[in-house]
Amino acid sequence: MRILVTPTFERAVKKLHKQQKASLDESVRTIVGQPEAGETKVGDLAGVKAYKFRMGNLLCLLAYRVLDGNTLKLLMVGPQENFYRDLKRTEP
């Protein structure tokens, strides 16, 4: 499966510690194996899926879009607080 990333996603990953990146990698592997694992959003974020996972003690969300059967676009990762508000600002 082909994985595309946005600049917003890259910036967020750059700030993570090694253990946090390991937990993010595990979540990405889960999504690649099961693209339907995330919760489908409606309204302004139609077409976006959000996958919830733990990064240490923190509940985090990973927003992604399945472009076709073979391509996955990772949009944003971060803590739950104000996540959807920030996602609306970055995603047209």
Language-model segments: what does each one mean?
Residues 1-27:
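Arg/Lys-rich, positively charged N-terminal/basic patches that mediate binding to nucleic acids
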Residues 2, 55-61, 65-92:
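Enriched for short, Lys/Arg-rich terminal
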Residues 16, 28-31, 90-91:
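Alpha-helix boundary/capping residues
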Residues 29-56:
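A short, surface-exposed loop/turn module that caps and links secondary-structure elements
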